[in-house]
């Protein structure tokens, strides 16, 4: 695969200047809620039943130790921001059980109608929402932000006119288009 330029130069710069590492997630391609659960709680899904989604089971009924609860004990206000619908994976009712004080979903975002070619709300709306969270409190804030713009499936047809980053060398032109869409 040949990519015309590094698609993540800012991340590479940050990786060189600060501590960094690899992050292993429990699912790829679906199951975002399980990755969120592990990130927010530090608990592995290996302690749950096969195919279980804590968001769809235990978290509907009870709270759970989590980063938001720990940080709230240190004086932080905990916010969750997600540019998708609040009821998807039951986040509207789950996030309070994970210790979040506020939850802003796509329905409450001013630019919610700004979509990418696949229909996902663009990530640029998240910046304004994060700033609103920061401005809403006097003290320190923990803001957990979930993006949807990069969700696949990635298009096999060319959707970007004059892409900044070009990709060649995949097994097919359709795969080149998918990689190019992802990189841009």
List each model region and its residues.
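Solvent-exposed soluble domains appended to multi-pass membrane proteins
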Residues: 1-184
């Amino acid at each position: 695969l040949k990519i015309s330029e590094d698609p993540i130069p800012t991340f590479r710069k940050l990786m060189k200047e600060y501590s960094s590492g690899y992050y292993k997630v429990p699912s790829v391609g679906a199951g975002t809620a399980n990755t969120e659960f592990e990130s927010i709680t530090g608990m592995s899904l290996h302690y749950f039943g096969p195919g279980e989604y804590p968001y769809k089971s235990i978290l509907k009924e009870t709270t759970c130790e989590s980063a938001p609860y720990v940080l709230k004990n240190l004086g932080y206000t905990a916010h969750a921001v997600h540019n998708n619908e609040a009821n998807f994976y039951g986040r509207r009712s789950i996030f309070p059980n994970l210790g979040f004080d506020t939850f802003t979903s796509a329905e409450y975002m001013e630019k919610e109608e700004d979509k990418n070619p696949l229909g996902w709300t663009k990530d640029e709306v998240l910046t304004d929402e994060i700033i609103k969270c920061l401005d809403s409190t006097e003290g320190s804030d923990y803001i957990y932000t979930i993006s949807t713009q990069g969700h696949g499936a990635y298009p096999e047809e060319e959707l970007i006119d004059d892409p900044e980053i070009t990709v060649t060398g995949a097994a097919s032109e359709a795969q080149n288009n998918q990689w190019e869409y992802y990189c841009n």
